[in-house]
Amino acid sequence: EHIKILLESASYAPSHFNSQPWRFVLIRDKARREHLGRIAGYSMREVMTKGNFWKRYLKYFRFSKEEMDKAGDGIHIDNMPSVLKPFIKYLFSEKGVEMMNKLRVPYILAIDSKKLVSRSPLILGVLLTKDEYKKDEHSGMYSLLSLGMAIENIWLSATALGIGVQFISLPMEAGGAYWQACIDLVQPPENYELVALFRLGYIDPNAKRPTIDWSSTQRKPVSEFCYEETFGNKWIPNCDCYFT
């Protein structure tokens, strides 16, 4: 079974003292997935309506392939209703929040978010043990690094199996009652903390894209983020002398 393959791949991730601080909760029940979908939808509407999301992440929004090629990072908003296209740069700006609300963009995004989460056959709850995940101690950072590697193992294995993975971030962005509702759904014991939620499902190449959607395939060249010996000393590619 593919789920077993994904979880076993996570188990092979390195962790400090082989502590394996992660735990995973599989949510497959239709009613529970739909409940989480509603939480995701309401969270999306809340965050987008207030506009804080745009202020925080606007620097990563790109509106053309040329912008993506130049920046090498961010997300390219490349799918939206034609009626919105003339206003796109204004809408996705700090000043455009009011117009965005008038055009009901947060509601469009909320409906799409609800559908995406509800229709995903598997939701993965990711937890860390509080015995190791202590935010004011080194073990807290070690635990997060270990968990990141475990999730990466899952992601790579999923990709090889034709399974898509997406982080369900909006309930956490909205915080408060929205994130608490997710915690209540997962029901972690006192000594475990819910850290993240992901949705998984087999990729359908013919599936209709969300009403407003983006792509993020662009990457910076290695020379832009790698340095030699000290930060700022540009690394020169094609020098493998240290491996000979």
Language-model segments: which ranges?
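Acidic, surface-exposed loops and disordered segments
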Residues: 1-244
